[in-house]
């Protein structure tokens, strides 16, 4: 499925400045706010060098020419998930755009196995990777792989999930969303969809990573401000459509009075919709559905009236990941976290913006 050229909008937390990246511009402008429209945002502001940031000099690593370097990308999960498909494709597309030869981009997939991801990263290093981009499976457990990269003085950019290791020591930086904020925005969308009353079921993501923890915290903290909505059930669907559907089927039986579902990714949300339809309920109306990601399937369901809102979590990390590596190699300071700001889909814009989804 073709990817929309809509950019990632980013905010570098350590620099207290917003970043917005597109694949077609490198000019500096004033910091950009999150886009509310469907068109591409045109700003791309650099992160100012800072004593608090991580620099090539501070790490003592040798300078590498990105265009001729061997770059390794470690994907964490099987690419049956639209997020992972788009994420990997974005890395490949940006590498090609930069003129990196296909045999200089090494890609592995851990198939949701932590030990395999550790082995994959070590294998990438053994195969000569000079720069690494890693989509961690879990927040914990990758230290042996990060130690191996550090021993070879290979910078590591982590994307999507934050690891508990030390930035600028064990890895260069984290690029990803503010997952607590995503949860809060999902709760706000739920309040709007339900009118602030009802019984909510939460389909949790997989355990052991900050995405699930933060999206749950943000949602519950925000929902607590509304007295008419209560969480009556929560169970993990492992970020998987079929598991989300199975969990929803169970929850319909045990809690037939559920009036709203918060799924911590779209795949589980789509699974919940399938379960609700099978049970004779009308998702989007009888039972409100809000999730996080921005997949085309979920956004189309909003347009069709079977879903209520999606908070985007943009997987197109390629341009920003490579831009960050380029800045690091040129001597600029890189903040510990680069946080992207995500869009939102609901009944007011889904039909117009479905082309931006992945």
Where are these regions (language model features)?
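Hydrophobic alpha-helical
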Residues: 134-150, 219, 233, 237-300
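Hinge/cleft segment of the Venus flytrap/periplasmic-binding protein
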Residues: 11, 25, 33-68, 203, ...
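Short, solvent-exposed amphipathic alpha-helices that sit
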Residues: 83-98, 182-186, 210-229, 243, ...
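Hydrophobic alpha-helical segments within soluble ligand-binding/sensing domains
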Residues: 56-59, 66, 71, 92, ...
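Flexible loop/hinge segments that line or gate small-molecule binding clefts
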Residues: 140-181, 199, 295-303, 345-354
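C-terminal motif of bacterial Sec signal peptides marking the signal peptidase cleavage site
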Residues: 19-23
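Short beta-strand elements at the ligand-binding edges of bilobed clamshell
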Residues: 109, 165-189, 202-203, 234, ...
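Extracytoplasmic "Venus flytrap"
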Residues: 46-90, 94, 98, 105-119, ...
């Amino acid at each position: 499925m073709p990817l929309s050229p809509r950019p990632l909008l980013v905010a570098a937390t350590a620099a207290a400045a917003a970043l917005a990246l597109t694949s077609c511009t490198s000019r500096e402008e004033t910091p950009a706010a999150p886009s509310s429209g469907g068109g591409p945002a045109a700003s791309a502001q650099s992160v100012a060098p800072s004593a608090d940031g991580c620099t090539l000099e501070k790490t003592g690593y040798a300078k590498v020419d990105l265009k001729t370097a061997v770059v390794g990308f470690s994907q964490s999960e099987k690419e049956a998930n639209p997020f992972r498909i788009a994420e990997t494709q974005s890395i490949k597309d940006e590498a090609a755009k930069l003129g990196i030869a296909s045999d200089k981009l090494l890609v592995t997939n851990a198939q949701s196995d932590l030990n395999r991801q550790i082995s994959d990263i070590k294998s990438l290093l053994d195969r000569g990777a000079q720069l690494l981009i890693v989509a961690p499976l879990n927040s914990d457990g990758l230290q042996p792989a990060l130690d191996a990269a550090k021993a070879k003085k290979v910078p590591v950019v982590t994307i999507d999930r934050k690891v508990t290791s030390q930035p600028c020591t064990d890895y260069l930086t984290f690029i990803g969303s503010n997952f607590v904020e995503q949860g809060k925005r999902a709760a706000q969308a739920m309040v709007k969809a339900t009118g602030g009353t009802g019984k909510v079921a939460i389909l949790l993501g997989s355990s052991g990573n900050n995405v699930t923890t933060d999206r749950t915290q943000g949602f519950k903290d925000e929902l607590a401000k509304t007295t008419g909505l209560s969480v009556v059930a929560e169970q993990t669907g492992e970020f998987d459509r079929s598991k989300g559907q199975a969990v929803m089927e169970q929850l319909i039986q045990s809690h037939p009075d559920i009036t709203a579902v918060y799924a911590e990714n779209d795949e589980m949300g789509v699974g919940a919709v399938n379960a609700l339809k099978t049970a004779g309920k009308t998702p989007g109306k009888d039972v409100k559905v809000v999730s996080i990601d921005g997949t085309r399937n979920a956004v189309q369901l909003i347009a069709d009236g079977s879903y209520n809102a999606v908070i985007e979590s943009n997987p197109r990390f390629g341009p920003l990941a490579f831009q960050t590596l380029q800045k690091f190699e040129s001597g600029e300071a890189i903040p510990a976290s680069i946080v992207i700001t995500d869009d939102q889909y609901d009944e007011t814009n889904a039909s117009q913006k479905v082309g931006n989804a992945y």
